[in-house]
Amino acid sequence: MSHFPKLLSSQIAYDVARTMLDGFDKHYRLFREVSHQAKLKFEAGDWHGLQQIQRDRIAFYNERVRESSVILEDEYDAENIEDEIWQQIKLHYIGLLTNHHQPELAETFFNSVCTRILHRSYFNNDFIFVRPAISTEYIENEESPTRPTFRAYYPGSREGMAACFERIVHNFQLERPFEDLQRDIGYVVRAVGEHFGDLRIAPNFQIHTLSSLFFRNKAAFIIGRILNGDRTFPLAIPILHGPSGKLVLDTVLLKKEQLLILFSFTHSYFMVDMEIPSAYVTFLRDIMPRKPRAEIYTSLGLQKQGKNLFYRDFLHHLQHSSDKFIVAPGIRGLVMLVFTLPSYPYVFKVIRDVFPAPKETTRELVKSKYQLVKQHDRVGRMADTLEYSDVAFPLSRFDEALVREFEQHAPSMIEYQRAKDGGEEIVVRHVYIERRMTPLNIYLQEGSDAQVEHGVIEYGNAIKELIAANIFPGDMLYKNFGVTRHGRVVFYDYDEIEYLTDCNIRHVPQPRNEEEEMSGEVWYTVRPHDIFPETFRTFLLGDPRVGAAFLRHHADFFDPAMWQSHKDRLLAGHVHDFFAYHASDRFIHRYGAAAEPPATPPVKQPDAGPARRVA
């Protein structure tokens, strides 16, 4: 039950609330500035610059939380503020958010500052936002009506499809010229027509596109939806730099599955300029209704809001379930203690206290590897992780075998405490949370011949894309990779990753005598960061079905020259192109660079005649 005061009588309470909101506003101003820079760097083809601002942005939030906490400590002795004043601080903050355009993000920022200042055993739910206090429904940008969240276009009543898409592209005002926009628009219209076929045009037929481009890797994406009758279809158009150096429309994505992969947890976060982020999330949920809001916020670079929503969803699931957390099935890891809740599609990973041989690492080194992945381009091949500290679980929901695992292998990472309802809790001091996937080793063991073929192709492609992005996985056993629900192979064990450019790629030396040739041990010198691709055969080709498929599709995997060529390109400053869609979907492959799209007349107003094609 809440015990808020009836009167807000403290000037300090208002000043603290104002200081905290000023800290958030500064954070979000800098966050949006990165999106402005992303557009300029995309237009200039400054790929290294894009990567740098993406990395820098990840640290912005914690820097502003730290900065605000220091100000509050120095100016208001915040740690010693009385409970009644903290309650007034929250109420003043709510008042300040009444007409704010990012209230949900500001509430999360308030929680971050509050929990940084106060120990978890001290702050209570009256001090922080356990649930949203300000609605994000129907927030409009009334100050700048020319910058709506999305723009609506009516191809059936005005310009026709080709003119409509041309206007959509021009409205983003990209400074770099297009190679041949008329050609590419023709491809878009042709692809839309092929996808929808004989679709009757309804009176409300229209196209909506979000007002800002989505920047990631070397692409800028137009994201939208097509409305026709009571149906909504997703729309995404990636814009790339073509071989000529000018811009091209690379494809058009029109399936929900394609958008889900584009916004997958295996990709880096987008850079998007959003005045009202909740409106963007609502729009994206409309075209991806299965996507949790937490994941959408995270994919937009608002990972702290994603963490906040994920934790709320998790607590809600705990309240409405009764199964127990168990040790995750499968091969036990040497670095991580992994557990899961069978009814929840995630795994929880805790760093062990001691690492048995042959592992040689430390807790801090493992954490640094996970942070490296957070900051690096994951290219659709590395799972994102949510990192939490001091998470309290009901002890009654922990299987006894799991408790024993903790007490034996990670006792320093847990403590027990009494919950406010009188029950016992187990507090996990540090945990990573990842999407649960089918381990690749199990997928290959139990799969059909076609599934084995698919798994091997995906595994090889995943490794090649990772090394093209300057990531050497280190431990490449199949058990360290998972298969997503879309059939993509993803890496998720990061404790041994290195930059490929830091590695020495070597041939196995020729034995100098019979004793070396017959030796069961490695007889040649191996230094840190040495890689011997020829030796990968030993642990990758053991299963006959897997081995045969591997040699059919990735025989170059065991050739040091393949690995060295990637390293050389990276050292020369090359930034690889990565696509979150199949190569066969690209216009250059689908229609051919020189193919002339068919002439497409404008779509007419709907009438009582027979069904017509969209294009």
Curated annotation (Swiss-Prot):
User: Which residues participate directly in catalysis?
Assistant: 384
Q: Which Pfam families match?
A: AceK_kinase (PF06315), AceK_regulatory (PF20423)
This protein's UniProt keywords: ATP-binding, Cytoplasm, Glyoxylate bypass, Hydrolase, Kinase, Nucleotide-binding, Protein phosphatase, Serine/threonine-protein kinase, Transferase, Tricarboxylic acid cycle
Q: Which gene encodes it?
A: aceK
Member of which family? Belongs to the AceK family.
Q: Does the keyword Membrane apply?
A: no
Q: Which domain of life is it from?
A: Bacteria
Tell me the classification of the organism that encodes this protein.
Bacteria, Pseudomonadati, Pseudomonadota, Betaproteobacteria, Burkholderiales
Enumerate the residues binding ATP: 328-334, 349
What role does it play?
Answer: Bifunctional enzyme which can phosphorylate or dephosphorylate isocitrate dehydrogenase (IDH) on a specific serine residue. This is a regulatory mechanism which enables bacteria to bypass the Krebs cycle via the glyoxylate shunt in response to the source of carbon. When bacteria are grown on glucose, IDH is fully active and unphosphorylated, but when grown on acetate or ethanol, the activity of IDH declines drastically concomitant with its phosphorylation.
Q: Which GO terms describe its cellular component?
A: cytoplasm
Where primarily located?
cytoplasm
The Gene Ontology terms for molecular function here are: [isocitrate dehydrogenase (NADP+)] kinase activity; AMP binding; ATP binding; phosphoprotein phosphatase activity; protein serine/threonine kinase activity
EC numbers for this chain: 2.7.11.5, 3.1.3.-
Protein name in UniProt: Isocitrate dehydrogenase kinase/phosphatase
Q: Give the region (Disordered) as residue ranges.
A: 595-615
Q: Where in the cell is it found?
A: Cytoplasm
Q: Please give the biological process terms from Gene Ontology that the record holds.
A: glucose metabolic process; glyoxylate cycle; tricarboxylic acid cycle
Is Nucleotide-binding one of the keywords?
A: yes
Reactions performed catalytically: L-seryl-[isocitrate dehydrogenase] + ATP = O-phospho-L-seryl-[isocitrate dehydrogenase] + ADP + H(+)
